[in-house]
Amino acid sequence: MEKVIELKDVWVRYGNQTILEGINLELKEPNGLLGIIGPNGGGKTTFLKVLLGLLKPYRGSVKLFGKPPEKSRELVGYVPRYKGFDFDFPISVWEVVLTGRMSHTGLLKNYREEDRKAAEDALKTVEMFEYRDRQIGQLSGGQRQRVFIARALATNPKLLLLDEPNSGLDPHMQDELYRLLDRLKHKMAIIMVTHDLSAVSVYVDKIACLNRKLHYHNSKEIPIEDLEATYQCPVELIAHGMPHRVLSNHEGNP
């Protein structure tokens, strides 16, 4: 079976500062949701950029679907944090989602019928097709996030990467977002980085902890030692609201 992701001893530096240290990760399943948790500044966004081929490690190897990331981009959808997005810019939902097809059409080429069909299917998947003519700035935060996910889905990805997709959403919108991802994970592999410990304990299939080093055991359970090492504080301060079954020690005992 072709591996979705294979990282071997990956190290990343900014200047003299090590951001990622000795990362090893292997995902074989073509579907499912992996949640990656960790503190601010722990390297989660950097990790996604490495998978996208936007950052090259100074040591180690990265492969997506058996190829280097730069040769696998058409197979990957990405939903970044849109901190600097100007929501007053006059662009419609439909136009936003169509831009997701640029990896197939090129920057200056016209959209084809297959591109429009892919955009339509993506909007229907996230239940936003009826809003296609709305300006993006007229939508709620949860609706915008669905549109950005549709933009990523328009590429027909085998792997979907999401960077803090629940950021800025109220609890109801977050719940809708997670239910959407719960449906999508049966069609593709998904990696989501987040601070929301309670959400990952409910919706993800597997969990990894990242704070420069990656702790991953191919399981939904998080060894208490890994959680404390990642957040550098006692588990009682960070695991409030997490189901007890999610936490384990390295011997597998509750």
Model feature map: region roles:
Residues 111, 135-139, 143:
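Conserved ABC ATPase signature
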Residues 222-254:
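ABC ATPase nucleotide-binding domains
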Residues 52:
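Helix-to-loop junction immediately C-terminal to a conserved catalytic motif
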Residues 1-30, 86, 108:
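A short, flexible loop at the N-terminus of ABC-type nucleotide-binding domains that lies
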Residues 160-164:
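Catalytic Walker B motif of ABC-type/P-loop ATPase nucleotide-binding domains
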Residues 98, 113-131:
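Conserved ABC ATPase "signature" region
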Residues 60-72:
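Conserved ABC transporter NBD signature motif
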